[in-house]
């Protein structure tokens, strides 16, 4: 049976935290009998897609541990083991409301109306990373003509694979230019051009995409097809820091961190140095 595509509420508002939806399908997870795979009519949960890790949060009072998309249908995997997810639920609720939060669990079955809440900190940190990566990749493409041929955004690092070698000096210059763009607090634009408009548009990631193409533009720096949530202005990225780089498959692999994740990485480095120095 074919399933109707899930309505992507995160496309409409990347800053929304709570939503309501109807369960279309609820099936036991084949790998774990304490988990269920749920399909909703609409969702705020961004799935693992385009190299980015999925949103986490709460659905129907249970922890969402994975979100996947196939043929436009988004599947949420929830953990129903109370002992395993209780603390995670409370913490996610505290991040959302600022208060201690006891989620109300509901029956998980087709036809049931449920409430969902995304883990906002996780979502926003991912938005910072992805928007920073767009600016970095756009500058590399403009200056050197190289394509971003590999991208991965995890909870600990962002890696980008470029189609040509970039010297350490040039990488440092790109890093500086990205942070200049961040300091300008430029509005980031999301548009849905028609096929005719798209044919006339110069943008990165120009691959065959079925259906409506979503274009994310950082004026003066990057125009790229992208499905992920982004910050509204470059200033929200905070900062970008190159963490590592190495020659890779005839090009270069560059690792970066942005915003709060970059700050946390440098706090950890400071703590290590302080411990080694006996401070």
Where are these regions (language model features)?
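A glycine- and charged-residue-rich anion-binding loop/surface
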Residues: 1-279
């Amino acid at each position: 049976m074919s399933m109707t595509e899930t309505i992507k509420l995160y496309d409409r508002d990347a800053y929304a935290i709570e939503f309501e939806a109807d369960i279309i399908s609820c099936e036991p997870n084949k790998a774990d009998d304490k988990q269920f795979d749920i399909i909703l009519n609409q969702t705020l949960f961004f799935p693992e897609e385009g190299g980015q890790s999925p949103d986490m949060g709460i659905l129907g009072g249970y922890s969402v541990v994975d979100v996947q998309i196939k043929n436009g249908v988004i599947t949420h995997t929830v953990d129903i083991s109370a002992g395993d997810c209780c603390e995670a639920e409370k913490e996610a609720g505290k991040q959302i409301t600022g208060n201690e939060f006891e989620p109300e669990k509901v029956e998980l079955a087709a036809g049931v109306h449920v409430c969902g809440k995304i883990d906002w900190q996780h979502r926003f940190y991912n938005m910072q990373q992805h928007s920073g990566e767009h600016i970095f990749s756009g500058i590399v493409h403009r200056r050197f003509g190289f394509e971003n041929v590999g991208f991965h955004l995890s909870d600990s690092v962002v890696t980008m694979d470029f189609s040509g070698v970039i010297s350490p000096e040039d990488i440092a210059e790109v890093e500086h230019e990205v942070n200049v763009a961040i300091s300008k607090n430029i509005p980031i634009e999301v548009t849905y051009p028609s096929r005719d408009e798209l044919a006339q548009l110069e943008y990165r990631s120009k691959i065959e995409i079925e259906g409506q193409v979503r274009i994310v533009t950082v004026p003066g720096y990057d125009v790229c097809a992208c499905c992920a949530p982004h910050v509204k202005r470059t200033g929200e990225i905070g900062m970008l820091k190159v963490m590592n780089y190495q020659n890779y498959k005839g090009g270069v692999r560059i690792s970066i961190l942005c915003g709060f994740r970059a700050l946390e990485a440098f706090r950890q480095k400071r703590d290590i140095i302080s411990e080694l120095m006996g401070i």
